[in-house]
């Protein structure tokens, strides 16, 4: 992402796309058969997403907004989000799932903060929304994936030093799939 978005990066991406289309156009027509199952199963099939506009789904529901408030985002895909306001109280959810994803806004800016994800009281991940390849876009990260389905209390807290930074959670997604790996 160091080459894009900028003028030289645009030219480079255009040449990549042009090459891809040329290769596809010149490739022999062959029918592709999908494999009967993914190698590692379907761990994220039927995922469910909650947002400020739809805070409850079958597998997950919002229980407390803490120091986060629902704000107008002004984008088509995510018109509202949970944004850290004043304080450090966690955004809380209850879920029955095997994996948890966080959808958040990231940017290449020192105004962006880090947040911690806790499952049943144990910290499982710290996510940094200040990323050098960020450009104020939605981004997702897998917080945790278990092999079995578990009841979870999920908490999202600002990391130490990020209490006054921009932390914008667009949604939380979960999936409930048993897996061997």
What are these model-predicted stretches?
Residues 8-181:
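Conserved catalytic region of serine esterases and O-acyltransferases that act on ester linkages
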């Amino acid at each position: 992402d160091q080459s894009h978005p900028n003028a030289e990066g645009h030219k480079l991406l255009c040449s990549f796309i042009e090459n891809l289309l040329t290769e596809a156009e010149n490739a022999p027509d062959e029918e592709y058969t999908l494999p009967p199952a993914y190698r590692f199963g379907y761990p994220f099939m039927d995922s469910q997403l909650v947002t400020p506009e739809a805070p409850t789904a079958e597998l997950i529901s919002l229980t407390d907004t803490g120091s986060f408030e629902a704000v107008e985002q002004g984008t088509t895909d995510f018109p509202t989000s949970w944004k850290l306001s004043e304080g450090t109280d966690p955004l809380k959810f209850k879920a029955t799932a095997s994996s948890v994803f966080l959808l958040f806004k990231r940017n290449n800016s020192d105004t962006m903060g880090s947040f911690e994800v806790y499952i049943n009281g144990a910290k499982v991940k710290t996510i940094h929304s200040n990323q050098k390849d960020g450009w104020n876009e939605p981004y997702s990260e897998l917080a945790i994936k278990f092999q079995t389905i578990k009841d979870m209390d999920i908490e999202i807290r600002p990391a130490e030093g990020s209490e006054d930074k921009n932390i914008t959670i667009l949604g939380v997604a979960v999936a409930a799939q048993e897996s061997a790996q």
